[in-house]
Amino acid sequence: MNSAGPKCVTLITGANTGLGFETAKALFARPEPYHILVGCRGQISRAEDAIEELQHLFPGTASTAQPLLIDISSDKSIALAFAEVQEEFGYLDIVVNNAGADLDTAVSSGRLTKREAWNQTWDVNVTGTQLFTETFAPLLLASKTQLPRLIFITSGLSSITEHANGSSPRYALAPAGWPKPDTLFLAYRSSKSGLNMIAAEWARVLRNDGVKVFNISPGFLDTGLGDDRASAERREKRALGAIDASVGGEFCANVVEGKLDEQSWPSKALRKNTVQPW
């Protein structure tokens, strides 16, 4: 069994792009040393390319990284990744549940049927996240740090309270009659509401083990959650007012560092400067 020495061993799913990559960048910029497992699905070269970019951006960093092939929608992939991490390290200090899917637009483009889009979105954002966490949780309990952390990534669109209050024009009542106007991002929004319950439950389950559990809402970021069409998706999000993903990466890195530890219990969804209503 190998060890990363004094470095904080941190696994970030979906870390080759988007918020996951921006979180890795933010950690590489810190003076504290991290050893980051750059999780990616598909081809391991995606993680290797991301690591090469990290090393290019931060040549003097004390942190290191290695690729980890993991697709949280696959039980086999989760099991293989767990076996790899368990054999090489035997523990984890930080887990960031970043991998996610937003496939609502795939319906309007004709790539997926509604059922396919809903099933795949929930499979990643809810089922996959739960099964991945369930598998890797024992490694957090074996952490070499005093305060292991488990982080979930929710969305501002997941708040049922804000939906009920009509706090956004998107929640305005629909006109009478049929057909109704399209409901935007409902598969994604509802899946993140489901994720909120998972995060709250893990906070309860791990409370007496000393694992700090966070559920963070990083804001509307110009990330690509869908697939290899991410660049076009990012352009569309910017046009709608999305902020740079690096802002979310800094927020997540602050949580990793422990700057929001006092907010870990009772369970809540954390925005950058406030608590997000359930």
UniProtKB/Swiss-Prot annotation:
Keyword Transmembrane on entry: no
GO molecular function, one term: oxidoreductase activity, acting on NAD(P)H, oxygen as acceptor
Binding, NADP(+): L19, D71, N98, Y188, K192, T223
Phenotype of null mutants: Abolishes the production of eupenifeldin.
Alphabetical keyword list: NADP, Oxidoreductase
Keyword match Nucleus: no
PANTHER family: BENZIL REDUCTASE, BENZIL REDUCTASE ((S)-BENZOIN FORMING) IRC24
This protein's name: Short-chain dehydrogenase/reductase eupG
